[in-house]
Amino acid sequence: MLYQMHKCKDTYKYKGAQCYIINRENAGPGHSHQSRFVFVKNNEIIAVANYMLVTNDVNPVLFTYDNLMDLAYDYNWFNHDNLVHIEGVGFDISYSSYSLCPMSRAHKEPEYFSFRRRVDFKRSTEYVGGIFVKDNRITRIIYPLGFGQKDIDVDLDFTENIINHIASVYFDIDHKIVICGYELPSEKQPKVNVSIDDQIFNAFMNRG
């Protein structure tokens, strides 16, 4: 099933944002009971709305095809059994092959994040592994079932550098990880200057 996305002039309560309306193919840019809305600011999706314009703020995510489709499925805009493709303006489809995402983009305070590998262009992703996060600390590294590895308890900073190190060391991912659906805390100098490599080494030494 094909949907099309058009720009809207209205921004509603989101000043400085660009509004997009999503309709079924050939329905045109008008507002109907099947319409859905996406609000974008600084090239990030900041909110979505249904046809009644009941809005939901989301943690800002890059305005990409994959992120748009994930939000659409999180909010049940489309039937999961249908192959949906959105054509339109605005989104950048250049995207890393690997991402780290909250279990649901709709969650404001996620605790479990999954590493995912994009299998092909249209929506398909493969679960690679995951991490648990509490109070901005990575507390556990999760392997897929049947992987033959035990999950590992760790105590690591929840930063982009360490996320990429975990992906490389534990899951053999040599691509940059795109963090989706969640804004990482700002990186601050720790009280004890422990390097990333030392943290990873200590985690390895404590593997059970």
UniProtKB/Swiss-Prot annotation:
Q: Which GO biological-process labels does this protein carry?
A: symbiont-mediated suppression of host innate immune response
One Pfam family this sequence matches: AdfA
Q: What keywords were assigned to this record?
A: Host-virus interaction, Inhibition of host innate immune response by virus, Viral immunoevasion
Residues of the signal peptide: none
Annotated InterPro entries: AdfA-like (IPR055608)
Described function: Plays a role in counteracting the host DarT defense system.
Similarity field? Belongs to the Anti-DarT factor A family.
Protein name per UniProt: Anti-DarT factor A
Species of origin? Enterobacteria phage T4
Question: Lineage, please?
Answer: Viruses, Duplodnaviria, Heunggongvirae, Uroviricota, Caudoviricetes
Q: Which gene encodes it?
A: adfA
